[in-house]
Each structure stands twice: as C-alpha cells, then as structure tokens.
Curated annotation (Swiss-Prot):
Pathway assignment: Amino-acid biosynthesis; L-isoleucine biosynthesis; L-isoleucine from 2-oxobutanoate: step 3/4; Amino-acid biosynthesis; L-valine biosynthesis; L-valine from pyruvate: step 3/4
Gene: ilvD
Protein's recorded name: Dihydroxy-acid dehydratase
PROSITE patterns in alphabetical order: ILVD_EDD_1, ILVD_EDD_2
Cofactors demanded by this protein: [2Fe-2S] cluster; Mg(2+)
Active-site positions on this chain: 521 (proton acceptor)
GO molecular function term, any single one: magnesium ion binding
Catalytic activity: (2R)-2,3-dihydroxy-3-methylbutanoate = 3-methyl-2-oxobutanoate + H2O; (2R,3R)-2,3-dihydroxy-3-methylpentanoate = (S)-3-methyl-2-oxopentanoate + H2O
Residues annotated with N6-carboxylysine modification: 128
Organism superkingdom: Bacteria
Pfam annotation, one family: ILVD_EDD_N
GO BP annotation list: isoleucine biosynthetic process; L-valine biosynthetic process
InterPro entries cross-referenced by the UniProt entry: Dihydro-acid_dehy_C (IPR042096), DihydroxyA_deHydtase (IPR004404), DiOHA_6PGluconate_deHydtase_CS (IPR020558), ILV_EDD_C (IPR056740), ILV_EDD_N (IPR000581), IlvD/EDD_N (IPR037237)
Cited SUPFAM superfamilies: IlvD/EDD N-terminal domain-like, LeuD/IlvD-like
Amino acid sequence: MEIFMPKLRSATSTQGRNMAGARSLWRATGMKEGDFGKPIIAVVNSFTQFVPGHVHLHDIGQMVVKQIEAAGGVAKEFNTIAVDDGIAMGHGGMLYSLPSRDLIADSVEYMVNAHCADAMVCISNCDKITPGMLMAAMRLNIPTIFVSGGPMEAGKTKLSDQLIKLDLIDAMIQSADKNVSDSDVDAIERSACPTCGSCSGMFTANSMNCLTEALGLSLPGNGSCLATHADRKQLFLDAATQIVELCKRHYEQDDYSVLPRSIATKAAFENAMSLDIAMGGSTNTVLHLLAVAQEAEVDFTMADIDRLSRIVPCLSKVAPNTNKYHMEDVHRAGGVMAILGELDRANLLHHDTKTVLGLTFAEQLAKYDIKLTRDEAVKTFYRSGPAGIRTTEAFSQDCRWETLDDDRENGCIRDKAHAYSQDGGLAMLSGNIALDGCIVKTAGVDESILKFTGEAIVFESQEDAVDGILGGKVKAGHVVVIRYEGPKGGPGMQEMLYPTSYLKSMGLGKACALLTDGRFSGGTSGLSIGHCSPEAASGGTIGLVRNGDIIAIDIPNRSIQLQVSDEELATRRAEQDVKGWKPANRAREVSFALKVFGHFATSADKGAVRDKTKL
C-alpha cells in the first residue's frame, strides 16, 4: 500500500521547471542549491522601538534564523506591527489597539500563504500581538511554536525610606492622586518600568504568554522567565530546534498531531481558561481565547467560561491584584507549570492534552513542575531572577534567587487547600443588562463589594467618564456606566484603565462600581465589569440605562440586574430604535479603517471577531 506523505507547502514555489523564476528570487534572498527541498520556516518577529515589550527583539529574530538553519531548516524572518496599549491609553490611539489584533492575524496569514511557508516560530510579547499570531496559527494550521519576549522586571524604589515594588499602574494611579508629592510621582515614573519586556504584573501580555503554555503551543517557562535573563535565550534556541523537529514529524512522518489545531483542542482551551481563572489573569484573555477558538473551529464559548469559573479556585495573586508579587515571583514559584500542577492535583486539568514538545501535560509536568521534578536544571531555571539594572538588552543578566518559592500554603502560588479563594479569579455575570454576559476579574475585587447596589451615572464615552470622575461628578455608591465603547460602538473597544485608575486616585476604588461594553487593561482591579454584551451599539440593554437607575451586582451568584421594569425598558428601546443606537453628543473622529473594523465587529461575547455573515 502506497503511503502519501504531506508535501512541503514550499514545494509549490521551489520545485519544478516552471518555478525557475520563483527559485531565482529565492536564490536572491540567500538560498543555496541544497536548501531547496528543506522546510521553509517563517520567523514571525514583532520588533519595534515603540514598545518596551518588543524593543529587545531586533537581533533575536536572526538568532532564531541561524539556529533553525543549523538544525536543518531554511528560515525567513518578517515583522508584524505592535501597539503599546500603555502608550496608546487615554486618547484616540486606544481605538486602534484591538483592531490591530485582527490586522496582525491577517498580515501573518498573508505573508505565510503568499510565500508558502511550511512552519512558523512566532516571536510575540505584548497585548494584541500574541492573540493575533495565535489566530493566524489556527487559520494556517502548520507546525508553530510561540516564544515571547518575556516579562519586564518589577520596578523598585524607596518612598518614605521604604523599598516598594512598582509597575506601570502605580505610575498612572499616583500621578492623579493630589496627595502624592511631585517628587514621589517623579520617583515612581522613573522606576516603574525599569527594563525591556512586557509590563511586570499579570496584565494582558503576560496573561496571554502564560496561556500559550497551557494551550501547549510554547515551551515551559515561556510565560514567566524574565526578558533580561540569560535563561530566556535558551528558550529561543530550543524553539528554533524543535520547530525543525515538528516539520520532520509532520512532513516526513505523516504526523498530524503536531499541528496547532491538534494541540489546541477543546480540552486545551479549557486548560488555558482554567489557568487564567486560577492566576487571576486579565479579562482581555477571555476576549482573545474566544477569538482564537473560533479560528481553530473549536466550540468554546462564554458558557464554558462560566462553568469553569465556578469550579476553579484562585491559586495565584499577582499585581495588579496585590502589590506583593510580580511575574518574577511567579517564575520563582515555578511559573505556569507549577499552577497547572496544582490544578492537576485538584483534578481540574485535562492532563492528556499534548504540547509542542510531543509530551502529554502529565509527562511535561513530571519534568517541569518544581514540586515533582528531580531535574536540578529545571529547578535552577526557575530560580532565575531580576538584576535590578535598567536596560533594554535581552539576556543581559544571570542573577538567581537563592531558593525557590515552593511554599504552597503561604507563597506566591498556592495549592487548592490554601487557595486565595475557592472562587476563581475571573467570573462571568449575566442578567437583563447583559443578556450575553459580561466579565469581572474577581481576584481584584475587595471582598466588601462582591455584592454592590448603586445608582447609575451614565457616560457616552471614556473621555466624558474621565472628566466626570476627575471633576467630582462621581460619588461613593455610584455605578459608573461607560457605553458605546464596544467593538462596534467605539469602534475598537477601548480599555478603561484611566477611569478605573482615577477612581482609585479619588479614593473611590472600593466605593463605586464600573460597568462598560468596552474592556479593561490587564492592569485594572476593583469592581470593574467589562465586555457587557450585547454592546450598546448593537442594541444592548446597557444603551437603555439612565442616570439614577439602580443596578444590582451580585458576584457570588453571578448576577447583574438593571432594576427597571420590562415595560419601561420596552418604551426606552422603542425610543432608541428611532435614534439609531448612537451615542448622544459625542464628538469623535473615526478613520475609515476603524469604521471598517466597526462594521464587521461582533460583540465581546463572540471575541469581537469579524461577523462572517456580513460577507
């Protein structure tokens, strides 16, 4: 019986007499005679000098290229765009952040399919780059390994003779607090972001890079090993070597188990979401996982997230949910593998799912969970720590903690019996104001306000909300409603980090709630409820709220209700139908590119992906 092996995709442009022109062009890129017939592997880099999470990636792409070629492949590098959400925050630039995710996915698809690449190493890091590349990987379904740029070291400075840890969010909050002196604000600003890498807390970038480990698409340690540490160099080299091995297994041995869709199954998405809930990750991960699942044609929905959020405990609290721990502390405690290990011991992990190492998670945890491993090299790897030296250079230091943090009772990562809470770090709420659900990061909510009822104060834009908060219009007991900021209504679904930060700086962090059809930065904490679906621009009930309406929030019972009668809501809906569901008195310049995004965008419960029914 004749066996037909998968043919190299690149053979389309490298084999046969009629491809002489294409081969001539390949030769002009540096390919030699012996290279034709080898797998062509795309090194998908995202270097830019605009973003600290990517500023150190310039030479890393070529390092990966050389290692791929040493392992027997042909490597070709290209770059994607990368938006820094922190720099784009608080002005019109934030409208472009979420749309950039889809643009990145499209651009990777375009480059890889146009040039018939056989596999990818995706070098991502910050908020929309990792999910955009994940979406592309699922579309393309060719051998792919993710290796990110790594987390930033936590900032440290002395205030009132006390050494404190800092991050970007501290700079935002303290700068708006009139009780903080100019000299202290200056010290915080200069110390909050000391190195290259993705911001040092469990914000969106680090959350997503951790989730690539749980999906099985990156190597152990990818989510937590610092950008500045020499150990991270080996992750890049190992990824480069392993991608050639995956190509051999697929194209020479007919092994389809190495493909992204075979690895990132429904069970893998559940593992990733369970990790996110356990570590109190960014609410943006919900949006992105839903989008990636759709590209993978996996039936993973808000209902699955709701189910998992009710059974998975909160096993790790990291900034912004606490000031005590940052990503460098998560790594010292064993990183993602340690959290997954605790989930496995609690029977909350599908440990038969596969990874890019060709192992099941049960096998991978046996080697990489610091509570199980006998490999001293693994333990040494997880002792890698910060140097405390300002730098934009990758792999520039090799400092190590003297000991690991393997305390599962009182340490950074806990076991289920000693969890920060038996209720997980994320929750989906639903009710008449959010028929398709909304998301809250419960790990960042003070226990005193898990149930909250208050009067609505409504704003038609983030800008108006900021003015209202800083201008004293928002009072204790208010539910701040910011609407028409969803994927369609923004358009672009801005992050509401400044409103939540300013509530804290005004002393209202535990005295108010915030509800929006927009989204939040991974740096947000407090009673901040986002992704309200359907959004106002799509006829969602959030568009019917009026000042003074009572909104009741009950996180333990996963409920959020607008206490207005159905009859009154029907009357308001009829009025709004006539008005066309547009924000009142909002002056906002919207480019053609953003209008196109808004036209096709679905609400957050669908991942804000494009509505294919409109094609």
